Swiss-Prot record:
GO terms for molecular function: ATP binding; histidine-tRNA ligase activity. Its main location: cytoplasm. GO terms for biological process: histidyl-tRNA aminoacylation; L-histidine biosynthetic process. The gene is hisS. Pfam families: HGTP_anticodon, tRNA-synt_His. GO terms for cellular component: cytoplasm. It is an enzyme of class 6 (ligase). Belongs to the class-II aminoacyl-tRNA synthetase family. It catalyses: tRNA(His) + L-histidine + ATP = L-histidyl-tRNA(His) + AMP + diphosphate + H(+). Its EC number is 6.1.1.21. It is found in: Cytoplasm. This is Histidine--tRNA ligase.
């Protein structure tokens, strides 16, 4: 007999795990809602042309790609930003700005599963479209930070700006391909590869750029880093403008952070401020990434629109938070014996409690009372209402506290007070 297994890189979530995920999801949603972001969702699959628009066909090996019955090439979404850009152009381009959206959904990447990395995973993120003001960048950073504070997660945020190194590349007349190669090596933290690439470029162009690049990468710290780097890059006008932009953003960020210009972000569409947030769990440290991408909407044939956003890796957040117990608030209603009259009374009681917002389970197995109580105990249900013939005729039921074992009679009219 075949025993079917879940696909490689996917997970089944047991009820206890789902309860914990729902608790964290609810707290993060609370923060998004408090900033008046509106929730959306997009199709699970999009055209491959959309998904590969920025990166080109080389992304094919990282996606789940298929053809529909009309021979159109489709792919399961690997993230949401491209889909949201398409959605914005379709539905929101004439909406008053800024457009503030958030989402929580599953994404798919065809890669080797490992700790904190799956083929199906969940992202929760935001996109703020229509404002190029520093305070818009700050709002997104603050929201990302406050979400993690809301769930009591220990973390560290690193903030940088792609324009600083880009200004250095421009000064030394590097091509876009050369600049992107260096960025990708920085993003991979491949220092040997970076040194080799810089040495090759220096030899080909007869320039000395390595020292300046590593000056930028090595300087990390608080806001004072900006003034120090402005001195070192005094002749690099574009870099100075990027540093001033970052300084204007940080004016509105009242949280602890580390300035780090080694943040390159793996996706090529970022254009300005970038940030990453790290937890403490080895192998799953990065829990959030984001930044500004002012050219993305235009790339998808929309009107030029500045944009900034971020995404949480929800699964990595779950790996980084301390384990916790979810308090059970459910109530079990059971008749002393199985009879239509008592079952109807149980249904009435359950209906009253459910309408008041309580989670109620009825005994659906016709168990004897002792076995019904054992079932409730096994499920961790702390309150059991026992419905007996004599008690119900007097307008009463028995309430049993499963933690203490205490049992008392209560009036039906007081049922909502339990």
């Amino acid at each position: 007999m075949i025993m079917f297994q879940k696909p490689k890189g996917t997970r089944d979530f047991l009820p206890e795990e789902m309860k914990k995920r729902k608790v964290i999801e609810k707290k993060l949603r609370k923060v998004f809602d408090s900033y008046n972001f509106s929730e959306i969702n997009t199709p699970t699959f999009e055209s491959f042309e959309l998904l590969s628009k920025k990166t080109g066909d080389e992304i094919r090996t990282q996606l789940f790609v298929f053809k529909d019955h009309g021979d159109r090439e489709m792919g399961l979404r690997p993230e949401l930003t491209s889909s949201v850009a398409r959605f914005y152009i379709n539905e929101f381009k004439n909406t008053p700005k800024p457009v503030k959206l958030y989402y929580f959904t599953n994404c798919f990447r065809y890669e080797n599963p490992q700790a904190g990395r799956y083929r199906e995973f969940w992202q929760m993120g935001s996109e703020l479209i229509g404002s190029n003001k520093p305070i818009a960048d700050a709002e997104v950073i603050n929201m990302a930070i406050e979400g993690l504070k809301e769930i009591n997660m220990d973390f560290e945020i690193n903030i940088g700006h792609l324009g600083v190194l880009k200004g250095v590349f421009e000064k030394y007349d590097l091509s876009d391909d050369e600049g992107n190669e260096i960025r990708r090596l920085i993003d991979k933290e491949d220092m040997d590869g970076l040194k080799s690439a810089l040495n090759r470029i220096e030899s080909e162009k007869n320039i000395e750029i390595s020292e300046k690049v590593f000056e930028v990468l090595d300087l990390k710290g608080g806001r004072e880093v900006i003034s120090k780097l402005k001195e070192k890059l005094a002749e690099f006008e574009s870099s100075i403008a990027a540093l001033e932009n970052l300084d204007s953003i940080l004016e509105f960020v009242p949280h602890e952070y580390i300035i780090n210009f080694g943040i390159a972000r793996g996706l090529d569409y970022y254009t300005g401020m970038v940030f990453e947030i790290y937890g403490k769990r080895e192998g799953a440290r990065q829990v959030c990434g984001g930044g500004r991408y002012d050219n993305l909407i235009e790339l998808f044939e929309g009107e030029p629109s500045p944009a900034v956003g971020f995404a949480y890796g929800f699964d990595r957040i779950m790996l980084n938070i301390d384990d916790f117990e979810v308090e059970e608030e459910s109530i079990f209603v059971v008749p002393v014996k199985s009879s239509d009259m008592l079952l109807n009374e149980c249904l009435k009681i359950a209906k009253t409690l459910r309408e008041a917002g309580k989670a109620v389970e009825l005994d659906l197995m016709g168990r004897k009372l002792n076995k019904a109580l054992n079932y409730a105990n096994t499920k961790g249900i702390k309150k059991v209402i026992i419905v007996g013939e004599n008690d119900i005729l007097e307008g009463k039921v028995a309430l049993k506290n499963m933690e203490t074992g205490e049992q008392s009679l209560i009036e039906l009219k007081d049922i909502l007070t339990i």
